[in-house]
Amino acid sequence: MARLDDATIASLLQEIPGWERQGDALVRTYVFKNFREAMAFVNRVAELAEEARHHPDITIRYNRVHLLLTTHEAGGITERDIALARKLAELAS
């Protein structure tokens, strides 16, 4: 899968609230009421990631979950990252 160009990434990110570009990755931090809610969200993220066969880097800090998406094989952001970011945004809404 090919990397997306800068203009395409910027345009597509306008459609996915809360997600930002950070270098060659898409990132977002979700904040929950407590650790239990954060972990429940992470488990749902894991299910979606398995279905998509595309796995984010996940950092958990008590009630905060930081997600980072990139396609290592392509060396940057691809349609797979955009598609998973969309699904994760829907999951959190």
From Swiss-Prot:
Transmembrane segments: none annotated. InterPro entries: PCD_sf (IPR036428), Pterin_deHydtase (IPR001533). It catalyses: (4aS,6R)-4a-hydroxy-L-erythro-5,6,7,8-tetrahydrobiopterin = (6R)-L-erythro-6,7-dihydrobiopterin + H2O. The keyword Lyase applies. Keywords: Lyase. GO terms for biological process: tetrahydrobiopterin biosynthetic process. One of its GO terms (molecular function) is 4-alpha-hydroxytetrahydrobiopterin dehydratase activity. Its EC number is 4.2.1.96. Gene3D superfamilies: Transcriptional coactivator/pterin dehydratase. HAMAP family: Pterin_4_alpha. Belongs to the pterin-4-alpha-carbinolamine dehydratase family. This is Putative pterin-4-alpha-carbinolamine dehydratase.
